[in-house]
């Protein structure tokens, strides 16, 4: 993973915002929140987001078209990610499960297809919402 000091100013600003967020953030919400810090155009946000994904600092939640900070220092960022998403409160938890990773690896091998990456999203109710 790339060190924080190697990030651009825009990447640092956006990473800081995403890390402090209590939930996934959409690109235009990010733009709205960083305008005062000199990031004025959507393209600036998308470039920073792309780089932060590439280096493993954040993940994209495909179903929400939103972004979250990577909480798992051992994750295979660009290859395999899985998330548990609460349908009630929208809480997102990164799933780190060795058995799941092995199963999906075997699945890819048996299917004969070469997967570049996968992003799994599990939906349900978190422990707080199912009470």
Identify the residue ranges that each predicted region occupies.
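Non-DNA-binding regulatory cores of transcription-related proteins
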Residues: 60, 64, 69-131
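Short, hydrophobic-biased segments on the C-terminal half of alpha helices
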Residues: 46-50
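Key DNA-contact positions within bacterial/archaeal DNA-binding proteins
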Residues: 43
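A short, conserved structural fragment
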Residues: 53-61
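Short, basic interhelical loop/turn and adjoining N-cap
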Residues: 36-40
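Short amphipathic alpha-helical elements of helix-turn-helix/winged-helix folds
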Residues: 13-21, 33, 55
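Short acidic, hydrophobic short linear motifs in intrinsically disordered regions
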Residues: 24-34
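Short alpha-helical segments that sit at the start of domains
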Residues: 1-16
């Amino acid at each position: 993973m790339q060190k924080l000091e190697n990030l651009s100013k825009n990447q640092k600003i956006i990473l800081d915002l995403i890390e402090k967020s209590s939930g996934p953030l959409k690109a235009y919400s990010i733009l709205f929140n960083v305008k005062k810090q000199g990031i004025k155009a959507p393209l600036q946000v998308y470039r920073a987001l792309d780089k932060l994904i590439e280096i493993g600092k954040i993940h994209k939640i495909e179903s929400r078209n939103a972004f979250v900070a990577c909480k798992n220092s051992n994750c295979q960022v660009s290859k395999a990610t899985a998330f548990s998403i609460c349908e009630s409160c929208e809480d997102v938890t990164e799933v780190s499960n060795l058995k799941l990773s092995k199963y999906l690896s075997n699945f890819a091998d048996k299917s004969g297809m070469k997967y570049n990456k996968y992003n799994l999203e599990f939906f349900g109710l978190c422990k707080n919402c199912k009470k």
